[in-house]
Amino acid sequence: KDGYPMRSDGCTIACLFDNDFCNRKCVEQKGKSGYCYFWKQSCYCEGLPDDKVYDSATSKCRA
């Protein structure tokens, strides 16, 4: 599934321009690849497991 990966607290992973950082974070969570989506300032991944993708309806993020 494509989408924003989550940290352990349920929030998205912030970034500014670092595609390598985001790609690493996505692969660590068993995704295929990832990049920094500048407009949302968050990492975006392709091919993540369903339970690793941020969903505002079920998120536990309180940031």
From Swiss-Prot:
An example Gene Ontology molecular-function term? toxin activity
Q: How is this protein annotated for GO cellular component?
A: extracellular region
List the GO biological process terms: defense response
Which residues pair up as cystines? 11-61, 15-36, 22-43, 26-45
Found, by tissue, as follows: Expressed by the venom gland.
Under the heading InterPro entries, the entry gives: LCN-type_CS_alpha_beta_dom, Scorpion_toxin-like, Scorpion_toxin-like_sf, Scorpion_toxinL, Scorpion_toxinL/defensin
List where in the cell it is found: Secreted
Q: Where does the LCN-type CS-alpha/beta domain lie?
A: 1-62
Q: Mainly resides where? A: secreted
| Keywords, alphabetical | Disulfide bond, Ion channel impairing toxin, Neurotoxin, Secreted, Toxin
The record's function comment reads: Beta toxins bind sodium channels (Nav) and shift the voltage of activation towards more negative potentials thereby affecting sodium channel activation and promoting spontaneous and repetitive firing. Only when tested on grasshopper mouse channels, this toxin inhibits Nav1.8/SCN10A sodium currents in a concentration and voltage-dependent manner (IC(50)=680 nM). This toxin hyperpolarizes the voltage dependence of Nav1.8/SCN10A activation, as well as steady-state fast inactivation and slow inactivation.
The family assignment reads:
Belongs to the long (4 C-C) scorpion toxin superfamily. Sodium channel inhibitor family. Beta subfamily.
What's the miscellaneous note?
Answer: Main studies are carried out on the Nav1.8/SCN10A sodium channel of the grasshopper mouse (Onychomys torridus) which preys on C.sculpturatus and has therefore developed resistance to venom-induced pain (in contrast to house mice that are sensitive to venom of this scorpion).
The name under which this protein is listed is Beta-toxin NaTx36
